[in-house]
């Protein structure tokens, strides 16, 4: 897809959202079932069933997916799609690119070993390695716009309001 195709595809969508801001509000959903036997949660991905379990650093076997890894994978996926979309829109040719994310966790927090240890990532690093002949000012713009428009990056960075409920079934 080139810049013209991208604009043509998105123009009517953007116009609809400008005319009716409520049309832009969409609720995305995820659902998982708690495994009756093991310590795992089966997440419906729409394509397959992803089984998440304990990370080996917390006693897991390593056979199931780690939800921390899944968070980083979601960040990489969203950032990669956003980067490519922005590059296309600003007509910055990319030959190839690699998106990587890594994050630091102190597992004492989630295991309740140390009440002062944080539960969750202390730091996340997102990196783009791109093969392009574009000038540095265009790369700076690409990075700035990718950060601005990446949903997962902005969600992690901004920390939205989150509510948690529980009910009997």
Residue ranges and their predicted role:
Residues 1-73, 85-169:
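Extended beta-strand/beta-hairpin segments
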């Amino acid at each position: 897809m080139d810049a013209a195709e991208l604009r043509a595809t998105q123009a009517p969508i953007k116009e609809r959202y400008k005319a009716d801001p409520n049309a832009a509000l969409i609720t995305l959903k995820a659902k998982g079932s708690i495994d009756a036997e093991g310590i795992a949660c089966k997440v419906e991905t729409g394509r397959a069933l992803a089984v998440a379990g304990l990370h080996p650093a917390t006693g897991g076997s390593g056979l199931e997916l780690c939800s921390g890894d899944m968070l980083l994978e979601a960040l990489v996926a969203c950032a990669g799609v956003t980067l490519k979309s922005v590059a296309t829109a600003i007509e910055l040719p990319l030959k190839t690119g690699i998106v990587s994310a890594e994050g630091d966790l102190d597992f004492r927090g989630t295991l309740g070993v140390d009440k002062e240890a944080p539960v969750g990532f202390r730091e996340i690093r997102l990196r783009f390695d791109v093969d392009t002949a574009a000038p540095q000012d265009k790369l700076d713009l690409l990075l700035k716009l990718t950060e601005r428009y990446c949903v997962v990056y902005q969600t992690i960075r901004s920390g939205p309001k989150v509510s948690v409920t529980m009910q009997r079934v």
